[in-house]
Swiss-Prot record:
Protein's gene: BCAP31
Coiled-coil region: 165-237
UniProt subcellular location: Endoplasmic reticulum membrane; Endoplasmic reticulum-Golgi intermediate compartment membrane
Topology term for the membrane: Multi-pass membrane protein
Cellular-component GO terms for this entry: clathrin-coated vesicle; cytosol; endoplasmic reticulum; endoplasmic reticulum membrane; endoplasmic reticulum-Golgi intermediate compartment membrane; Golgi cisterna membrane; Golgi membrane; lipid droplet
Identification of the protein by name: B-cell receptor-associated protein 31
Organism: Homo sapiens
PTM annotation: Cleaved by CASP8 and other caspases.
């Protein structure tokens, strides 16, 4: 394997490791959000867009080069005279195998680049929704406590007005308290609606993250299967060549 394909394969292994790390269930999105907001990660992200575009361009060029090599060595029977070159068939099969291997490596690297970027975005969105959900819940609890407090004060004022024998204008007090109660109830209902909307968004984000995790696990299994086929084909190619050299 040449130096450039060794670098691409190493990058692919690193991508698989990071995807598996992000899919670990016991690390919460909030903790990942703290990591993403750290100074080191923010420094990397500041140059990340340019690096990502350059990386995508390089991987696309490598995929195109691998496809070109596959088409070049695809039909060996029409390009090689097997009677005059008995060992050429094995040579062409080896070239074709390497081109296919390079296509798999570059293709999976390109796919995991988009998958990794999308997975990080979904985790950040999920952490933001969790924080918003907690904030709305606290606001709803605060509004509920305030409403209970005003209702208790309303009852106390009614009792005080009855004891004083009409010294207080009970009608005006009741009107004011009812208006305050209606206002508090409206605020409470608004907070409940916002909390329900946030919960729906959170469930949607969690479903998207779960789908991305399942997709990444499927890609990892497929890559492991291709590695096994790679090893088998490599052994099949190296065996006849070793015998030929002997």
């Amino acid at each position: 394997m040449s130096l450039q394909w060794t670098a691409v394969a190493t990058f692919l292994y690193a991508e698989v490791f990071v995807v598996l790390l992000l899919c670990i269930p016991f690390i919460s999105p909030k903790r990942w959000q703290k990591i993403f907001k750290s100074r080191l990660v923010e420094l990397l992200v500041s140059y990340g867009n340019t690096f990502f575009v350059v990386l995508i361009v390089i991987l696309v060029l490598l995929v195109i080069d691998a496809v070109r090599e596959i088409r070049k060595y695809d039909d060996v029977t029409e390009k090689v005279n097997l009677q005059n070159n008995p060992g050429a068939m094995e040579h062409f099969h080896m070239k074709l195998f390497r081109a296919q291997r390079n296509l798999y490596i570059a293709g999976f690297s390109l796919l995991l680049s988009f998958l990794l970027r999308r997975l990080v975005t979904l985790i950040s969105q999920q952490a933001t929704l969790l924080a918003s959900n907690e904030a709305f819940k606290k606001q709803a609890e605060s509004a509920s406590e305030a409403a209970k407090k005003y209702m208790e004060e309303n009852d106390q004022l009614k009792k005080g007005a009855a004891v004083d024998g009409g010294k207080l204008d009970v009608g005006n007090a009741e009107v004011k308290l009812e208006e305050e109660n209606r206002s508090l109830k409206a605020d409470l209902q608004k907070l409940k609606d916002e909390l329900a909307s946030t919960k729906q968004k959170l469930e949607k984000a969690e479903n998207q993250v779960l789908a991305m995790r399942k997709q990444s696990e499927g890609l990892t299994k497929e890559y492991d299967r291709l590695l096994e086929e790679h090893a088998k084909l490599q052994a099949a190619v190296d065996g006849p060549m070793d015998k030929k050299e002997e």
